[in-house]
Amino acid sequence: MLPRVIALLTGLGLCALAQAKPTQYPLTVENCGSTLTFAQAPARSVTIGQAATEMLYALGVGDKVVGTSLWFNNVLPPFKALNDNIERLANNEPSFESVIAKRPQLVAAELEWVVGPQGVVGTREQFHELKIATYLLPSDCEGKDNRVGADGTRLEPFRVDTIYKSIRQLAEIFDVQDRGQQLNDELKARLAKSVATVHSKGLKQASALVWFSSAEMASDPYVAGHKGVPEFMLQTLGLRNVVQSDEEWPAVGWETIAKANPTVLVIARMDRRRYPADDHEQKLAFLRSDPVTRNMDAVKHNRIIILDAMALQASVRTFEGLEQLATAIDGYDLPK
C-alpha cells in the first residue's frame, strides 16, 4: 500500500503542472437525472447545504454566491471573511420564496431531500420553470434511493469519486477548471497521506461506531450505515463499522450497539442545535453516565474521536476528517 501512496503523491505533483482547457459555452452537464445547459458562467448562485457552499468557496467563486443555507458547522476559517459578507437565508432549510428572491441563475444543493422530487425547499422543476438551474452534489443521488429511509438508502457503497466529480463539474460550470483540478489533486494527496499514517498499524480486528445525533438524548441514536461516507472513511483506514444497515443514518438502539462493543467511537460535533445530541458535550456526558454505554470498551478506554459533522458528509471536509481520524487511530493501541 505505501509504495502506491508514494507513487500517487508523485503523480499528483505531475498532474498539477498540466493546465485544464477553458469552458466552451454553451455547456451541457448531466446531473442526477437532469440535463443542464449553461450559456455562460452563473453570476449569481444560492447554496442549500454547507458542502455545496464550501465547495464553491474552495473553487474561488464565492463572489458569485449571493445566499447560503443549511449549516451544521461554522464555516472553514479561511472562508470566514468571505462568508460574513454573504447573506445566510436560513440556518436550516430556506423557503422557496427566499431562494428565488435572490434572483439566482444557479441553485447548488447538497441533498436531494431539499431540492428534488419531494424537496422540502422545492422541486427541480419548480426552479427550472423560473429559468433557474439546479445542481445536486452527485454523492447524494448516485447509487442512492432517497425515497427509502429518513435520510435515504444506499444502493451501493459511497464512492469518493463523486466528490471529485462535483468539483470537476462545478469548476467547468464556473470556468475555473485549473482551480478544480488543483483542488482535486490536493484532496487526493490528503487521502493518500491519511492512509500512509495508519499503514503500519495493520488493523484487521478494530471496529467503530459513528454517532451523528439523536432526536432526544435517551432515544436511539442516528448512526452511520455501512455504505455511506463514514463507512468509506472507516474502511479506508482499516476499521470495521459495527452497523450493517443500508440506510444513510439509521436509528439503532444502544443495547444493540453495546453488544457489538465497538473498539472506537466517532461522534459528530455541530454548531447547529436542532436536537439535544447535536451538542457533542452532551453526547460525551451521556456516553460516560448511561449504564449501558459507560461499560463499552471505547468509553472505558476513552477511545472517542470528535469530528465536525461536515467531515462525515460528502464534502471538501471529508479529507480533513480522514486526517484527524487517522491521527487519532495512530495514537491508540488497537487490536490488529
List each language-model region with its residue ranges.
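Extracytoplasmic ligand-binding site segments that recognize negatively charged/polar headgroups
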Residues: 114-122, 132-169, 201-229
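Alpha-helical, coiled-coil/dimerization segments enriched in small aliphatic residues
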Residues: 73-74, 85, 220-249
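Structured C-terminal subdomain patch of bacterial secreted/periplasmic proteins
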Residues: 157-166, 267-336
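A short, structured surface patch at a secondary-structure boundary
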Residues: 44-117, 239, 273
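Short helices/loops that flank or line small-molecule/ion binding pockets
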Residues: 96-103, 121, 252-261
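Second-shell loop/turn segments in exported
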Residues: 42-43, 85-86, 110-114, 149-157, ...
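Bacterial Sec-exported substrate-binding components of ABC uptake systems
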Residues: 5, 9, 18-54, 156, ...
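Short helix-initiation/N-cap motifs at beta->coil->alpha
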Residues: 29-33, 87-97, 140, 246-254
